[in-house]
Amino acid sequence: MSVPQIQVEEVSEKDRPAGAAVPPDDHLLSLKALTEKLRLETRRPSYLEWQARLEEQTWPFPRPAAQQEASLEQGACGGGEPLMPLKEPRDLLPPSASAGRGDRPLTTGKLEGFQSIDEAIAWLRKELAEMRLQDQQLARQLMRLRGDINKLKIEQTCRLHRRMLNDAAFELEERDELSDLFCDSPLASSFSLSMPLKLIGVTKMNINSRRFSLC
């Protein structure tokens, strides 16, 4: 009985058809697209340590026979010792395990608490589905949090601009009152700008020190 292989393929943005858009309920893909757009990278020490440990780990994958022969010939031509071919997975087992197993095919006995391989695969699929659901929930919370932060930033900017407009309006009223009281005062020279600029409080004295918005 051969062990079934599970292949999980994820469609990237490049492989996605041109007319197909990201589903509205797929928050994980939206978060990934936003991360790539903003060029965000995690800098958590735990993640960096895990990534470094994963890169340093060597995986004894079996190589084709042609590649093994090429490596042996390269070692012989170089004058050094020939490279040892990679061992088969059964050679990596302890002597007791390899002697007990022999050449018997893989049976459907108990596998780490499971009655059969199908039961283990069903449990694995269930765990992956639950992890996928948790990822979607976290991605939805992060996207909602980002929207709330942007909304608060816009509201704060509007409040600041509204306050500056109110200050400019009060200053304009004070200058109008002073200009009525002192007609010959040099303050009247500050109103030499155009009428629309004077209505919003932009004068020669504060044109370089204030910033205004349409909020």
UniProtKB/Swiss-Prot annotation:
Residues 1-26, 63-109 are annotated as: Disordered. InterPro entries: FAM167, FAM167_domain. The keyword Coiled coil applies. Keywords: Coiled coil. Disulfide bonds: none annotated. Belongs to the FAM167 (SEC) family. This is Protein FAM167A. The lineage of its organism: Eukaryota, Metazoa, Chordata, Craniata, Vertebrata.
